[in-house]
Amino acid sequence: MSRKSERLVNLTIALLATRRYLTKSEIFRSIEGYEGNDESKERMFERDKDDLRSLGIEIEVGGFDPIFNDEAGYRIKPE
């Protein structure tokens, strides 16, 4: 399995397994393959989200507190 495929599988599992939204920093810390500086991690994550969406996987984006404009979080709602 390629590194990218492994990272996409691990990202999918992490986003499915959580009940709350995961921040990018949590994702970058917990999923192997997000390496380099912050900008390269961001670009990689955006490509990964696009790849998952092109496969029909719906990624929810939400915040932790609707009153405050907190950092966005991500999850996949189980069907």
Task: Identify what each model region corresponds to.
Residues 1-79:
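Short, basic/aromatic recognition patches that contact phosphate-bearing ligands
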